[in-house]
Structures are given as structure tokens and as C-alpha cells.
Amino acid sequence: MIHLEGITKSFGSLQVLKGIDLEITQGEVVSIVGPSGAGKTTLLQIMGTLDSPDTGMINIDGTNVSRMKEKELSAFRNKHIGFVFQFHQLLPEFTALENVMIPAFIAGVPTKEASMRAMEILDFMGLKERASHKPNELSGGEKQRVAVARALINQPAVILADEPSGSLDSHNKEELHQLFFDLRNRFGQTFVIVTHDEALAKITDRTIHMVDGNII
């Protein structure tokens, strides 16, 4: 599913990733943990083709993306990878349903099909009755679930999440954490989650520990 080999990355004189080798299989829920500055977010961004490594090879869902041009990468990213961040980044002028549909529009999915897909996912997440509400009418937990639904709309093979529950209270954290496993079981996606949350790391299928740009 995800294969990284010899990944290095530097910013100026600071080497952030120091030869990362990593294999993640289809359907795994994997957490990446480590102290601040360990390189977790940089690794996730490279895994998601949002940034490029200085050296190394990246294979995602059977495709070597290492040599792709930006236009190819953008199309690949929109189809194969979903992203969830700490802050939901929903567009305030659109409803929950419309926010979820945006990546489908970018991918050229017809409006009717995009709407049906979005409503199916929102229904699965218990948000069907909130579909017509705008972000300022939703709770923090609801907004983050809408963001997860948006990440799923194009049926990507992998979901990459960076501190997805970092801004939530304990109850909403637990609900979101369980949601990742429910989604994996329902849709079969692979989840890679950068987190400082020990409770989440403990329940993932595998935990990857990073220190100073290395996996230990």
C-alpha cells in the first residue's frame, strides 16, 4: 500500500528525515508518535505528496510517485489520498454537505453522484440531519467528522491525519478515534495518523516511533 525507501529531507542545514524506510499494508490503522521536531509531520507530508524528499522512493497504492510532475501529483493526490488536519478547515459559506462534496467536484464527479456519495458518508457518521448546516452551526466534534467525510468522498486508498483530535475534548476524541476503525472496517481504507495522543496510539494496529528524523 505505502512503501518508502531511503527518504531524506533537509531544510537548509537541518536534516529532518535521515533515511526513512517504511512499509504500511492495506487496511492498517497506523500511528506515528514522537517528540516535537522528530520529523513526523514532514514524513506525513512527503507520504501525501504535499512535499518532496531530497532522496528516496515513494510508492503509494502500487504507483511510484517519486518522479511525477506537479500536475500528475495533484491529480493522483486528489484521487488516492485523503487528508485530515487538526483544524477542520471547512469553508464557512458552504453547508456540511457542500464542504464534503468539494474534492469530488475537483475530480470532475457529476453533482448528483457527488451529493449521493457525500450523503451516504454523512449518514454513516450520524450527520445526515446536519447536512444542511453551515460550520458555525456545528459542534467541534461534528465539524471534524465533516472534515473526515470530505477526506473520504473520492474513495481514496489512504487517509493521512495530522493530530486529527488535537483540538477536541475527551468525549469527542474517543468518538473520532473509534470512527477511524469503523471507517476502515466499512470502506477498507488505510489510515496513517500523526498524534501525541497516547490513548489513540495504543489502540492503533501499529505504532511507529520517531526520534530526530529516524524510526526507532
From Swiss-Prot:
Pinpoint the ABC transporter domain residues: 2-216
Q: Which GO terms describe its cellular component?
A: plasma membrane
Q: Which residues bind ATP?
A: G34, P35, S36, G37, A38, G39, K40, T41
Which molecular function terms from Gene Ontology are attached?
A: ATP binding; ATP hydrolysis activity
In terms of PROSITE patterns, this protein maps to: ABC_TRANSPORTER_1, ABC_TRANSPORTER_2, LOLD
Q: Which terms are listed as keywords in the entry?
A: ATP-binding, Cell inner membrane, Cell membrane, Membrane, Nucleotide-binding, Translocase, Transport
Give membrane topology per the record.
Peripheral membrane protein
- EC number(s)? 7.6.2.-
Compartment list? Cell inner membrane
Q: How does it assemble?
A: The complex is composed of two ATP-binding proteins (LolD) and two transmembrane proteins (LolC and LolE).
Task of the protein: Part of the ABC transporter complex LolCDE involved in the translocation of mature outer membrane-directed lipoproteins, from the inner membrane to the periplasmic chaperone, LolA. Responsible for the formation of the LolA-lipoprotein complex in an ATP-dependent manner.
Family designation: Belongs to the ABC transporter superfamily. Lipoprotein translocase (TC 3.A.1.125) family.
Its protein name is Lipoprotein-releasing system ATP-binding protein LolD
Q: Give the species.
A: Bacteroides fragilis (strain YCH46)
